[in-house]
Regions:
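Amphipathic alpha-helical repeat scaffolds
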Residues: 46, 53-57
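Residue-level detector of conserved, well-ordered beta-strand and adjacent loop positions
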Residues: 32, 52, 114
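A mature extracytoplasmic/lumenal domain signature
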Residues: 43-45, 85
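Structural microenvironment flanking redox-active thiols in thiol-disulfide oxidoreductases
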Residues: 60-114
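Bacterial Sec-dependent N-terminal signal peptides
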Residues: 1-23
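A glycine-biased structural micro-motif
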Residues: 23-24, 46, 76
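N-terminal "domain-start" segment that seeds a small globular fold
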Residues: 19-42
Length: 114
């Protein structure tokens, strides 16, 4: 029965038309930095861009340290790291200033944060 269902799903996917509507290309996207400056993705054309969802109270908070190492080592070779804090899961509380201060004092980061 599982094989029949799987086969049906595969066949059905061939006959459906994707209707994705692209209103904006990734290169047209911009962020507002934690300092209030606009970060335009298009400014980083021809560079390797790493955009990472970050939070200062999650199990992966130490990723800040690794991201800073990556940024420090490869920024002169065209790597750009952008941290995007999100409080969707209640793991990034505080104001922009508190988040910025925490990241800079705890992990010494200097890559852009939104």
């Amino acid at each position: 029965m599982k094989k029949i269902i799987t086969l049906f799903i595969i066949m059905f996917s061939f006959f459906t038309k994707g209707n994705a509507q692209y209103e904006q290309l990734a290169s047209d996207f911009s962020f507002k930095s934690i300092n209030g400056k606009i970060i335009n993705i298009n400014d980083y054309k021809d560079k390797v861009l790493v955009v990472v969802n970050v939070a200062s109270r999650c199990g992966f908070t130490n990723q800040y340290q690794d991201l800073q190492k990556l940024w420090s080592e490869f920024k002169d070779k065209g790597l750009v790291v952008i941290g995007v804090p999100s409080d969707n899961f209640r793991q990034e509380p505080g104001s922009n200033k508190e988040i910025k201060d925490f990241c800079e004092t705890t992990f010494g980061i200097d890559f852009p944060i939104t």
